[in-house]
């Protein structure tokens, strides 16, 4: 049975996220990369199939400077974000990643994760970089397009931010 819930980004959760990421991002190998950025007070919305994590969505509070850099197209590679840009609390959020295991795609799981996020945090100023056509298509349902940076990369922001 598929369930979606919010969980803290503990080491255990980050190790599960890393396993999913390795399917798509083989260059992110070390758990220390995750631990340097995410803290237990950060959270993820995870999709579980009979208790096994099969997908996740992470959006974390960030400094306004990072939020603005994303919106302006200055920051387009989140691997290089200084971990000091992530905060414990902020009105600005950066949607770091949404990943669903290949075998579970096409079941609207990404939408369930984003529905859960926006149900809990309807007023957060959230930005993201869509780096694939699938990501772009998904983002269009929940965010407003700020700008296309290239054929595959686009900046989106929560609708309340772009169209107050």
Spans of model-derived segments:
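Conserved acyl-CoA
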Residues: 84-88, 112-126
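Conserved acetyl-CoA-binding loop-helix of GNAT-fold acetyltransferases
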Residues: 97-100, 105-119
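Conserved acyl-donor/pantetheine-binding loop and adjacent beta-alpha core of acyl/acetyltransferases
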Residues: 58-97
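Short beta-strand micro-motifs in enzyme catalytic cores
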Residues: 43-45, 91, 152-155
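Conserved GNAT acetyl-CoA-binding A-motif
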Residues: 92-95, 119-133
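Conserved beta strand-loop-helix elements of the APE1-like EEP
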Residues: 156-161
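Conserved beta-strand-loop-alpha-helix junction that forms the acyl-donor binding cleft
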Residues: 98-105, 127-155
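Short amphipathic alpha-helix that is part of the acyltransferase structural core
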Residues: 1-35, 39-54, 58-63
